[in-house]
Amino acid sequence: MMEKGIWKDALIQSTKKLSPKLQLKNPVMLLVYVGAILATSLYFLGFFGISDEKSGYTLAIALILWFTVLFANFAEAIAEGRGRAQADSLKMARKDVLARKLKNIDDKTDVIEIASNDLKKGDIVYVLANEQIPMDGEVIEGAASVDESAITGESAPVIRESGGDRSAVTGGTTLVSDWLVVRVTAVSGESFLDKMIAMVEGASRKKTPNEIALQILLVTLSIIFLTVSATLLPFTEFASKQAGAGSAISITNVIALLVCLAPTTIGALLSSIGIAGMSRLNQANVLAMSGRAIEAAGDVDVLLLDKTGTITLGNRKASEFLPVDGVTEQELADAAQLSSIADETAEGRSIVVLAKERFDIRGRDFAEMHAEFVPFTATTRMSGIDYQENTIRKGAADAVRAYVTANGGTYPKECDAIVSKVAGAGGTPLVVVRNNKVLGVIYLKDIVKNGVKERFLDLRKMGIKTIMITGDNPMTAAAIAAEAGVDDFLAEATPEAKLELIREYQREGHLVAMTGDGTNDAPALAQADVAVAMNTGTQAAKEAGNMVDLDSSPTKLIDIVRIGKQLLMTRGALTTFSVANDLAKYFAIIPVLFYGIFPQLEALNLMGLTSPTSAILSAIIYNAVIIIILIPLSLKGVKYREMPAGKLLSRNMLIYGLGGLIAPFIAIKLIDMLLTVLGIV
C-alpha cells in the first residue's frame, strides 16, 4: 500500500505527536490522552501503595489508552507522510537559479544576472533553451517548447507562447527549445510550486467548515459522556450503600468507560480523512487552493462543461463538401482548399486533406498566383485568399451572409437549408463564397467522445445537472447536446452569458462547478463555487479559480466532483460507524459493569461476558484496534458509486450503521473469550 520509508517515518512521527501542544489540536483524542496520563499516574500510585487501584489492571488500561493515542497519531502521520513524499519530488524542481533580467526588452544582450529568489513582480527575464524558468510568469515575447514534467508528471513538452491562452509559465520548468521573454508574476515563497509543496505537505491545510462542524458535534458528545462518567463515581458509591451489595466503580474503570463511549474512532481518523482527500486530488494532478474547494466539489449539483475537449474530441474534421445548385463538388472543394491553405487550425488542415483525397487537388504555385492570404479574425469570423482578381472567403453562415449582402450579392435560400441540415446533425457549417457568389457549405463533423453519454447518465442518477457550454449556433448545440446526453446547453456563449448563468443557478440555491483557461473565463471562474483553471491557461484564469488542473484536461472536472463526493462519503460513513460503535459498546459494557450493584442487569448481559474487568478490557482493546483496522479505509476512501443521494444514504446506513452496531458485539465477545482462555482475567 505504501513504501516502507513512509511507514517507518509515520511510526517516528506518531511518537513525536505525543507532545501536549499537538494533542490540543484534536479535542476528542485529547480526552484519551489525559485519560492515559491519569491511568498511568494511578498505576504508579497503586504500585507504591498510595492508592487502592489494582496495579496490574490499571497498567493494562494505561497501556491500551497510550496505544489508542499512538494509533490515532499514526493514522494522521501516514496521511501526512504520503504528502511529504510527493512534496520531496516537487522540492527537487524548486532550486535557486541565475536569471537573466533584461534592462531593456528590445535589447536581449543588456542583461543583469540575478538569483531567482531575488526576482520581483514585474521583472522581465530572458530564458534560453535548456534553461530553467526562474519564476512564475507570463510570456510577453517568443514561443518555445517547455518540459513541465517536474510539475505535471507528463513527459511530452508543451508549447508556451505570448498572447492567447498558453502564455503562463511555471518556475521550475525547463525550456526544451527556442527562447522566451517572461514577465515575473510571483515572488519567492508565493510561486505555483511553493503553493503546491505547501498544500501536499499539509502545512497550509485548514479545517473545512464541515470538518469544524463535525468536530464541534464530536466535542459536544465527548462533554456529555464526560459529564455522565464523572457522576458515576458518587452514584455507584451511593447505590452500593443503599443496595448493600457491590462496590463503587473505580477511577480506572471510569476513565476506561469514558474512552469507550466517546467518539474516538472518527475523532482519531478525522484529520487523516481530510489529508487523504487532498492527497487523492493531488494524485489526480489537481492542485486545490483550499480544503473548502474539495468539499464544495462533493456538494456540487450543477456542472458547466465546455463542449470542445470535454464532450467532443475537440478536433472537428471536414467530412463533406455540399455545393449549391449550379456548382460542382470539385469546384467547391477547390475554393475551400484555397481558402484554407494558410489556415493552421486542425479544421483548416482537414479541409485541405479532404480536397486532396477526394479530387487530388495539389501542387499549386502561390507565388505565380500572386496570392495574398487573409487570416481569420474574431471580428470578421472569416478567412480566405485573394489572388489574380479572385476573392475567396469561408466562415460562419451569418458572417458570410453579411459579407455577401454588403458587397451587393445575393445569399441563396438553398444555402440556408444546407446550413440547417448540417447544424441539425450536430456538425459545424462553413460557407464558401468566391467573387461574391456562394458556392456551398463545408461540413465539419464534431465527434462526441466514447462513453461520455454513460458518464452523464451516472451524474444524473446522482442528482447532478450537466450543462454544455459552446460557441456553436443553437441548432448545432442542440444536436450535440442530444447525442451526448447532457441536461441543457448554452449556445453562442459569451463570458457575460456564462457569468449570468452561474449567478442564476446560485440564486436558486445550487452549487456550480466549471472549468476555464482564458482571461475571458476569469469572471465566471471567480463566481463559480468550484472553479478549475487549466495549467496551460492564463495567469488571470489561475488566480480566479480555486483549483488548477496540471494536465489541463477539461474532463477532469467530473473526476474532481467524484473525489469531493468520496471525501464526504468517507467522513459520513466512518462517523456513522463510530456513533453506532459507541451505542453497541454502551449496551455491551454497562450491564456487566453494574450487575454487582443491580443483579437484575445480569439479564442484559446478552454476550455472557466473563466479568466487569474482562468487559472493560475487551471493549477498550477493541476501541484501539478498530482505529488501526480503519486506517486503510480512511486513506483510500469509501468506494464511490453513482446513485441517488437517498439510495446512497440507505446503503451506507446499512453497511456502516448496522455494521457499526454488530461489529463491537462480535469483536468484544471474541476478545473476552481470548482473555479468559489466556488466563489474563
Curated annotation (Swiss-Prot):
The active site is at D306. It is found in: Cell membrane. PROSITE patterns: ATPASE_E1_E2. Mg(2+) binds at D517, D521. It is a multi-pass membrane protein. Signal peptide: none annotated. Keywords: ATP-binding, Cell membrane, Ion transport, Magnesium, Membrane, Metal-binding, Nucleotide-binding, Phosphoprotein, Potassium, Potassium transport, Translocase, Transmembrane, Transmembrane helix, Transport. Pfam families: E1-E2_ATPase, Hydrolase. Its EC number is 7.2.2.6. CDD domains: P-type_ATPase_K. One of its GO terms (molecular function) is ATP binding. Its main location: membrane. Belongs to the cation transport ATPase (P-type) (TC 3.A.3) family. Type IA subfamily. This is Potassium-transporting ATPase ATP-binding subunit. It comes from Listeria monocytogenes serotype 4a (strain HCC23).
